[in-house]
């Protein structure tokens, strides 16, 4: 499923993501825009691992896809569940990622497109 920007923002807000570990709702929406363009089915292969779903969660550290050597699976989930339309496990795993010392900087797309930028446009016009 490709989520509408505002629909996605509303789901995140309901799930307690606004301000979670100091990350504003607009930053989360910016991150997902640039990682997956709000597409739950997004898959991107890297050398030795793969990124899955709307937040592009990586199989080396966070989920198990059964084909990544020495995978940690810190979110204790199958990567497959990150590709369905239900965002609850994606959100729980994203929360787990930002609890690490690196926080939201774990996402390259956030560092490239959202860090130190005016991200208010990502939730502008959304009824939140």
UniProtKB/Swiss-Prot annotation:
Keyword Amino-acid biosynthesis: no
Subcellular location: Secreted
Disulfide bonds: 6-126, 30-114, 63-79, 75-93
Entry EC no(s): 3.2.1.17
Keyword Membrane appears in the UniProt entry: no
Keywords assigned by UniProt, alphabetized: Antimicrobial, Bacteriolytic enzyme, Digestion, Disulfide bond, Glycosidase, Hydrolase, Secreted
Pfam families: Lys
InterPro entries named in the record: Glyco_hydro_22 (IPR001916), Glyco_hydro_22_CS (IPR019799), Glyco_hydro_22_lys (IPR000974), Lysozyme-like_dom_sf (IPR023346)
Gene3D superfamilies in the cross-refs: 1.10.530.10
GO biological process, one term: defense response to Gram-negative bacterium
Protein family: Belongs to the glycosyl hydrolase 22 family.
Protein name: Lysozyme C-1
Organism: Sus scrofa (Pig)
């Amino acid at each position: 499923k490709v989520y509408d920007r505002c629909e996605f923002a509303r789901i995140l807000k309901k799930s307690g993501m606004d301000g979670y570990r100091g990350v504003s709702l607009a930053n989360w929406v910016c991150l997902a825009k640039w990682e997956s363009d709000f597409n739950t089915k997004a898959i991107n292969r890297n050398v030795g691992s793969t990124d899955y779903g709307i937040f592009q969660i990586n199989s080396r550290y966070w989920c198990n896809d059964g084909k990544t050597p020495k995978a940690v699976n810190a979110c204790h989930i199958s990567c497959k569940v990150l590709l369905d339309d239900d965002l609850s496990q994606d959100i729980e795993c994203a929360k787990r990622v930002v609890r690490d010392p690196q926080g939201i900087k774990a996402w390259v797309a956030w560092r490239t497109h959202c860090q130190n930028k005016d991200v208010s446009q990502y939730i502008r016009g959304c009824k939140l």
